[in-house]
Amino acid sequence: MRGVIMAEKKKKPYEIGELDQYLFGQGNHYEIYEKLGAHLVQNGKQKGVYFAVWAPHAQAVSVVGEFNEWDTEANPMKREEPLGIYTCFIPGVKKDQMYKYCIETYSGEQIFKADPYANYAELRPGTASRVTDIENIKWTDTEWMTRRKTWNHKHEPMSVYEAHIGSWMRHPGREDEGFYTYR
């Protein structure tokens, strides 16, 4: 039909939409943490978890975890074009359950990765992410946040967070899967 514009299917608030894709692609999506990662949601009458991960060079991605006995075929994700963000909703997944993304490369290799947007993870030596409910965290730092407004940050000590590359990279071909270093 000429002149007909097809509207995008109405997205749920937690789903990746066209604006999210645009802002993320521009590097200006300052709330992308609300979309990527694992989020406890209600989808109609079903409670579960909405998963989303950016994997632009993957042939396929699935979610594996305690809830599906780490089965790589149980929960495939859908590729959202044009940026290669993979998404899926899995009913019945609960808080504190462990999961990873199984990424299939174009050479057919399967790589298991922790969620870069996870809010909680298992302790080392394990590398799985954990589903958590950040909406119901009871913050107890009101006094500190109020005092912080009066500080001159230019004259205060600074903390630098180290993102550990070992959680995403391994030495290829090493049986012990040795961690990379910054050297």
Model-derived features: where do they sit?
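Short beta-strand elements bearing conserved aromatic residues within extracellular beta-rich modules
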Residues: 61-63, 99
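Extracytoplasmic/secreted proteins and extracellular or luminal domains
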Residues: 53-54, 156
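Structural beta-strand segments of beta-rich domains
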Residues: 47-51
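Short proline/glycine-enriched turn/loop motifs at strand-loop junctions of beta-rich domains
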Residues: 54-61
